[in-house]
């Protein structure tokens, strides 16, 4: 019966759930900090109020919420910025990636690497806007698999907040 302790089983499951919680809390913390730039009072700042409500919905500790708001007033803290990135995905699919980061160059390099590994490429901002008015449908299952892999890789990236495409639902 060696190696079958109950704690070792729980430990592995707990590590996975803690990692997922940490990623969610990080994303929500960045959203709160970004929203708090417009004002640190949730009563007068609806976007901050919404971000706090979202954080509370997933049981984010109040200490983390307060720390995220405090980052805005503390000038020694690193400032966050929002990036809007456009890319051309597999099969000519238009992608918009929204990210919140404290280091623009690092985030752009990481997203560019993910796109390159998944048969996609960055394009100039605004050059694909027209494509979102013309939804595409996929007939090739291999392209759908590539897109699923790309969306999963982008979703695993901590700074990425939202990914949208011109695929018809």
Model region roles, listed by residue range:
Residues 1-136, 168:
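N-terminal cationic and glycine-rich segments that engage phosphates or anionic surfaces
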